[in-house]
A protein has these predicted regions:
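Conserved donor-binding/catalytic core segment of Leloir-type glycosyltransferases
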Residues: 200-217, 223-234
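Conserved acidic donor-binding segment of nucleotide-sugar-dependent glycosyltransferases
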Residues: 257, 310-311, 315-322, 330-337
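Active-site donor-binding segments of glycosyltransferases and PAPS-dependent sulfotransferases
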Residues: 26-98
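Short alpha-helical donor nucleotide-sugar binding micro-motif in glycosyltransferases
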Residues: 266-271, 360
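Membrane-proximal helix-turn-helix segments that form the acceptor-binding/catalytic region
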Residues: 128-161, 169
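Acidic donor-binding loop of glycosyltransferase active sites
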Residues: 269-281, 294
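A charged, aromatic-enriched C-terminal amphipathic alpha-helix characteristic of glycosyltransferases
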Residues: 320, 338-372
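Nucleotide-activated donor-binding/catalytic signature segment of Leloir-type glycosyltransferases, i.e.
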Residues: 243-265
């Protein structure tokens, strides 16, 4: 049986890419396809010789770095892959790649990290950001209308959806009219020993954020709150918001940029608590922090409501506002001594890689049996 694994973009290593890496472990002989590939960022995980890319890879670098330039071409790029020889297609998608066209008798399973955010949930935000006058604003609206119509059509090409959380499952039902299976993403819970050979070790305890620095992650709220609280905060991650956030931050906030896994885990192990200020469909970083016995302060929406247990593994704040987040930090600080690292670690065991592999394999076998491919 020939298997194709396909992912939206292999240009940076975030939570979705970690899931895709685990899918590769389950299907080591599968061929890999993606719309765009960055060897510098992803070559360590996916060698260039193993990757099939779309025609977008030949576009100028400035276009490839800014996806808004690529929007009109992305549906066609997804449909351009020749998958006629594959019996099983597994897409890992939060945008366009689920729209690939497989042969009629092939089984297409989509592990959906999120329906396309900017064209559905964040449509008004996206249009509001296009401050280019009436004609360009109208063009952006027409383009979004086309992309939403294409996205609905692309969802019909998927035989089976898997959602990464109840939050995502609800959105798949709402936007695509499909009933998905829920399989939580795999989280690395195994590395409990982290060697303290790291230089520049913080001399005081600190709060921690591990995140891509993009607008929807709401890191700006945390920066403003910690400016006000004057508590130590370390932020690990890279993204287009980094320079702006650094300008906002006072001396109690430190940005470390991208860091390798061993160093990230060291900071998890030694932090007071993890701060998760945005709404995400699942959110792998909070689970990683909890696997080290550290409590989490999270916004009370999205996937965090499925992973954080209030008063047991962390706390919530209710409004996307600086004062609400600051109040949450104060509460968490007062209650830190009441959290048991052992209890927190136990609570996240259900998100292990082993559990993900068992559940995913079982679902694939059932799907193939239903289709008559086994």
């Amino acid at each position: 049986m020939k298997v194709a694994l396909i992912h939206d973009y292999l240009i940076r290593c975030g939570g979705a890419e970690r899931v895709f890496f685990n899918l590769r472990q389950i299907f080591p002989r599968a061929d890999i396809y993606t719309l765009l590939y960055d060897k510098k960022e992803m070559g360590k995980y996916f060698p260039k010789t193993e990757i099939g890319t779309s025609f977008l890879q030949k576009f100028p670098k400035i276009w490839r770095k800014n996806h808004k330039y690529l929007l009109p071409f992305l549906p066609t790029a997804a449909e351009s892959f020749d998958l006629r020889e594959y019996d099983l297609v597994i897409s890992s998608s939060s945008s366009f790649i689920k729209g690939v066209i497989s042969r009629p008798k092939a089984v297409h399973i989509c592990y959906c990290h999120s329906p396309m955010r900017f064209s559905w949930d964040y449509y008004s935000n996206y249009i509001g950001e296009q401050k280019k006058g009436f004609l360009l604003s109208l063009a952006a609206r027409l383009l979004m209308h086309y992309i939403r119509m294409w996205d609905r059509s692309a969802a019909e090409r998927v035989d089976y959806f898997i959602a990464n959380s109840k939050t995502t499952a609800w959105r798949i039902k709402r936007y695509y009219g499909k009933e998905p299976k829920i399989i939580y993403p795999p989280v690395d819970l195994g590395m409990k020993q982290v060697f303290s050979t790291i230089t520049d070790i913080p001399k005081e305890k600190y709060f921690l954020i591990v995140s891509q620095l993009t607008p929807y992650k709401k890191i700006n709220l945390a920066v403003e709150a910690f400016n006000k609280l004057d508590l130590p905060l370390i932020i690990i991650g890279q993204g287009p918001e980094k320079k702006r956030l650094e300008k906002m931050a006072l001396g109690n906030i430190k940005f470390l940029g991208w860091q390798p896994d061993a160093i990230v885990k060291y900071y998890y192990q030694n932090c007071l608590a993890m701060i998760f200020p945005g709404e995400d469909d699942f959110g792998i970083a909070p689970v990683e922090a909890m696997s080290f016995g550290r409590p989490v302060l999270a916004y009370r929406k999205g996937g965090a409501t499925e992973t954080v247990i209030e008063g047991i593994t962390g706390e919530f704040f209710d409004d996307l506002a600086v004062e609400s987040l600051a109040d949450g930090v104060r509460r968490l600080t007062l209650n830190l001594s009441s959290y048991s690292p052992l209890v927190i670690r136990k609570a996240v065991e259900k998100f292990s890689r082993e559990r993900f592999e068992i559940d995913f394999r079982e679902f694939v076998i059932q799907a193939l049996e239903k289709s008559g491919s086994l």
